[in-house]
Amino acid sequence: MKNISLLGASGSIGTQTLDVLRSHPDQFRLVAFSVGKNIDYAVKVIQEFSPQIVSVQREEDVLKLQAVSGNTKIVYGSEGLLEVALHPDAEIVVNAVVGSVGLLPTLRAIEAKKTIGIANKETLVTAGHLVMEAARKHNVSLLPVDSEHSAIFQCLNGENEKRISRLIITASGGSFRDKTRDELHHVTVEDALRHPNWSMGSKITIDSATMMNKGLEVIEAHWLFGIPYEQIDVVLHKESIIHSMVEFEDRSVMAQLGSPDMRVPIQYALTYPDRLPLSDTKQLNLWEIGTLHFEKMNQERFRCLRFAYEAGKAGGSMPAVMNAANEVAVEAFLQKRIGFLTVEDLIEKAMNHHNVIARPSLEEILEIDAATRRFVMEQI
């Protein structure tokens, strides 16, 4: 029986993580979780899983939950998030929150020697050097939950990572993959939220449409697997059947395939190095699919992917700036305050405005994050 703490239980990854726990009640126990403002959902999860600690975003929601939570301790805010991450009984902390708010809980959980199931891209994007140093220092495993990084991780089982020639990350292309840049001037929030292959939260669905999601994954892969950016490629693959590939020195290529279902990489992170049945996921039938398509990625068409490569190669504080600018811009787009292509423009302005700090401390990263958010908000 593995004890699990789940950060971000009401989001897309969080709800699918609970599906996995539900499927294997003899294998996993939920000891703590966090939610934002979805209190009705939190009540249902408490009633089903009986966790010891639950954290909510706002203090005013604590009393609402306490009235129905029984023996479950209710906490709130950033301190509450840390309490969930540091639950003394938790062996695995699944970080499924959206945005840079996931950074500090991850670092503290690593220091407490928890195994980390990392679904929060922004943690490695904003502070990859700090996270990987901490993981090495405390001998902690970071197990990828993203389908692409899980695919690479699985392809590397039993392999010598020094023999890697290239990582090939696949991209569905998002909801606007067939549109020209001229057509993107007029797209709506509703258009952007219709992803062709995956069921995800609103922020990551917009990131998929801009291709920033893939850019974040490139930076994340750089840190997780220690591969230079020059050896990380992205290929457009509309079917989302091949989740990523690894090319080795002898030009052999290993790929991980499967029907698009986030529960597969989530469960693998929780059961690693073992595997368990996942009977209600769709079996892959290649003869039904017939053909798999691949296209070269155009970084002028998808400028956010180019920004991510530029930020990653610049290093230091630049990825944190790019990430903060993107979070503010995407939120403004979701609120219909800016157009779709303005997201790219705001990120570019923020990156051009910033002077890179080579090895920023945690405090400097948090300051840069806040300053970048203020700068971008002033541009809107």
From Swiss-Prot:
It holds the Pfam family DXP_reductoisom. It is an enzyme of class 1 (oxidoreductase). Pathway: Isoprenoid biosynthesis; isopentenyl diphosphate biosynthesis via DXP pathway; isopentenyl diphosphate from 1-deoxy-D-xylulose 5-phosphate: step 1/6. InterPro entries: DXP_reductoisomerase (IPR003821), DXP_reductoisomerase_C (IPR013644), DXP_reductoisomerase_N (IPR013512), DXPR_C (IPR026877), DXPR_C_sf (IPR036169), NAD(P)-bd_dom_sf (IPR036291). It catalyses: 2-C-methyl-D-erythritol 4-phosphate + NADP(+) = 1-deoxy-D-xylulose 5-phosphate + NADPH + H(+). Keywords: Isoprene biosynthesis, Manganese, Metal-binding, NADP, Oxidoreductase. NADPH binds at S10, G11, S12, I13, G36, K37, N38, N120, E122, G201. Mn(2+) binds at D146, E148, E217. Belongs to the DXR family. This is 1-deoxy-D-xylulose 5-phosphate reductoisomerase 2. It comes from Bacillus anthracis.
